[in-house]
Each structure stands twice: as structure tokens, then as C-alpha cells.
């Protein structure tokens, strides 16, 4: 599914991609195999634009919004790399590829921390850490307990969207009541996008309706 972005947002997305690629340039040949795996990944495609939109709607600085979109892009990349590492029961081979997967994933997490320091936003770690824990829990449930596809999306994808809205709302100093609404908007929007992208159109209808209602309530 294609989403229509304004011309300005398209330019900002290009800048996010430039920042992302520049940081990984020393390992470009090594990480290409991971990036190829994300070519058709719906979250990979849509998350940066959603983050930018969430931050712009709060009236936050453009350069800061771009930096945050890059941070979320890096977080999702690192989480994806780590999620592809299997355990012994799943036939994981202990070789250089495994070592690099772990190292590059850890490096990117460290890079995210540096980016937060650079923009003086380390306070957001209190929101990122629970998000990462939820995603990790979702990956474990996915591989060990065979939960439904929708439950997997709720645990491993949607927390990125809701956290984007919550962090934007906190930085904009929303009241607790309005912050809760804005976070719910991010959650429902994320569920709608991910369900539509994974051909769960009927299940997405309620989340689309709730997103519209929350947007109207917030506005």
C-alpha cells in the first residue's frame, strides 16, 4: 500500500535516509544483506514518515523531528537484526555471521544512545526501554509459543508507532490527559497500517475508525 506524503515530507525522508546510511557507511557491504531483507517490510517503509508526522503535528523543530525519525529507523533496524538470530533448537549456527549480527545490532543500539545525547533527548530512554522490552517479548512469543499474526504485530511492530506519538507528546509538554489520547492515536494508527499491510482489512476497520475518533477528540 502506498501513502501520499507532502513534498516537504519527502525531502525530510530523504534526509533521514542520508543520516541512516552515513552512520552505517563503514560497514555498508556487510549490512546490505540485512537491508535487503527489509525491502518489503511494511514497518520499515512507513515508520519514518509516521514519526515525522507525529512530531510535526506537535509543532516540534524540523531538524529535531528528522533526528528522531532516524533514531526510530535505527532502533527498528537493530531490533530486526537481533530478531533474526535463532537459538540452538532452531538450528542457529555459531559462526562469524552470527557474531557480526550480534555486534552490529549492539553497535546500532549504542549509536541510538549517542544520537539521543547529541539532541539532548536522553530523557526519552524511559519510553524506549519499555518499548524494546515489549518487542523482545513479542519476538520470543512469536518463535516459542506460535501466537497469532495479529498478536505478533501488536507486540513487535505497533509499540514503535505508539512510542513515537508518546515521545512527541511529552516533548511538546502535553497534559497527561492529552498525552494519553495522543499515544492511543499512535497505537490505533499503527495497528491500522500494519493490519492493512498484512491483508487483515476487516480487522483494520475498527482501528481506522478509532484513529479518526481519537484525532477528532484530540483536535
Indicate residue ranges for each PLM-predicted region.
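All-alpha prenyltransferase/terpene-synthase fold signal
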Residues: 1-219
Amino acid at each position: 500500500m502506498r501513502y501520499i506524503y507532502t513534498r516537504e515530507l519527502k525531502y525530510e525522508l530523504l534526509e533521514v535516509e542520508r543520516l541512516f546510511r552515513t552512520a552505517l557507511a563503514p560497514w555498508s557491504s556487510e549490512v546490505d544483506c540485512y537491508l535487503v531483507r527489509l525491502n518489503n517490510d511494511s514497518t520499515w517503509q512507513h515508520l519514518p514518515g509516521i514519526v515525522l508526522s507525529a512530531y510535526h503535528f506537535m509543532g516540534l523543530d524540523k531538524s529535531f523531528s528528522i533526528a528522531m525519525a532516524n533514531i526510530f529507523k535505527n532502533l527498528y533496524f537493530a531490533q530486526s537484526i537481533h530478531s533474526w538470530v535463532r537459538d540452538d533448537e532452531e538450528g542457529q549456527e555459531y559462526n562469524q555471521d552470527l557474531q557480526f549480527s550480534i555486534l552490529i545490532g549492539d553497535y546500532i543500539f549504542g549509536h541510538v544512545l549517542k544520537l539521543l545525547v547529541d539532541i539532548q533527548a536522553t530523557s526519552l530512554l524511559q519510553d524506549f526501554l519499555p518499548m524494546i522490552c515489549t518487542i523482545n517479548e513479542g519476538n520470543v512469543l512469536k518463535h516459542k509459543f506460535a501466537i497469532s499474526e495479529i498478536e505478533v504485530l501488536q507486540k513487535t511492530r505497533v509499540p514503535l508507532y505508539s512510542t513515537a506519538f508518546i515521545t512527541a507528546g511529552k516533548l511538546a509538554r502535553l497534559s497527561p490527559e492529552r498525552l494519553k489520547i495522543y499515544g492511543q492515536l499512535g497505537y490505533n494508527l499503527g495497528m491500522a497500517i500494519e493490519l492493512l499491510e498484512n491483508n487483515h482489512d476487516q480487522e483494520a476497520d475498527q482501528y481506522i475508525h478509532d484513529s479518526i475518533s481519537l484525532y477528532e477528540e484530540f483536535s
